[in-house]
């Protein structure tokens, strides 16, 4: 709820209209909550579960060891690697080419990490993993706990309107459940979109398929 309030304050200052609210995973819950409190044209919730129950192991990792938490999310969240490596700009070099590789060691701007199993995989995951960087240790822990505790009121669920839901058929973290109470007012043919052969991070795994779905939704 506090995250929703912050977004509302920002939107009030910006004085925007004809808003389309969107969020992925935890951010999708914020967008959903916001959609019941702030005027909008449409809300798009990507890869959300409700209730979004986060396991104790992940919560413990997020509190004490962010690397372990991110590894957990990568292990269960990713179904496939993108065919084309995502290019990012950083430290004056494009892509992940700035890495140094030798005998399983990966040298990144954040230090040297030894990866015994698959250093190439670690390199390909870098553009996604860098999204989880945080300035304070507790950020991920707080966010994940808020997922577990988040609930909409009954009247909010009944009043959900013009909400589009995007799921991925190989997502182990936020599975599509046609019986979910959030989908009571949804038209399952027009409001629910399912990406094929994709896990929890479609913008990383299959951006082309995601773009096609976006075009269907927004056209």
Question: Which residues does each PLM region occupy?
Answer:
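Conserved alpha/beta-hydrolase catalytic His-Asp/Glu region
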Residues: 60-158
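Conserved loop-alpha-helix segment in the C-terminal half of the alpha/beta-hydrolase fold
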Residues: 159-198
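A short beta-to-alpha transition loop/helix N-cap that caps and shapes the active-site region
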Residues: 49-58, 70, 80-81, 173
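Active-site loop/oxyanion-hole signature of alpha/beta-hydrolase fold enzymes
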Residues: 1-22, 208, 212
């Amino acid at each position: 709820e506090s995250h929703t309030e912050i977004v509302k304050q920002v939107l009030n200052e910006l004085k925007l209209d004809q808003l389309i609210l969107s969020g992925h995973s935890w951010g999708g819950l914020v967008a959903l909550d916001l959609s019941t409190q702030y005027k909008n044209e449409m809300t798009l919730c990507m890869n959300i579960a409700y209730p979004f129950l986060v396991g104790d192991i992940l919560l413990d990792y997020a509190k004490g060891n962010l690397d372990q938490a991110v590894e957990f999310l990568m292990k269960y969240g990713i179904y496939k690697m993108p065919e084309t490596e995502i290019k990012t700009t950083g430290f004056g070099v494009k892509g992940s080419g700035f890495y140094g590789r030798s005998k399983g060691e990966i040298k990144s701007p954040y230090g040297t990490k030894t990866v015994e199993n698959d250093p190439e995989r670690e390199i390909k995951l870098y553009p996604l993993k860098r999204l989880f960087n945080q300035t304070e240790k507790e950020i991920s822990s707080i966010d994940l706990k808020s997922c577990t505790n988040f609930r909409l009121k009954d009247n909010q669920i009944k009043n959900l309107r013009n909400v589009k839901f995007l799921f991925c058929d190989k997502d182990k973290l936020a599975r599509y459940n046609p019986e979910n109470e959030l989908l009571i007012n949804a038209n399952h043919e027009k409001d629910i979109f399912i990406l094929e052969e994709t896990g929890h991070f479609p913008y990383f795994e299959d951006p082309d398929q995601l773009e096609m779905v976006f075009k269907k939704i927004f056209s």
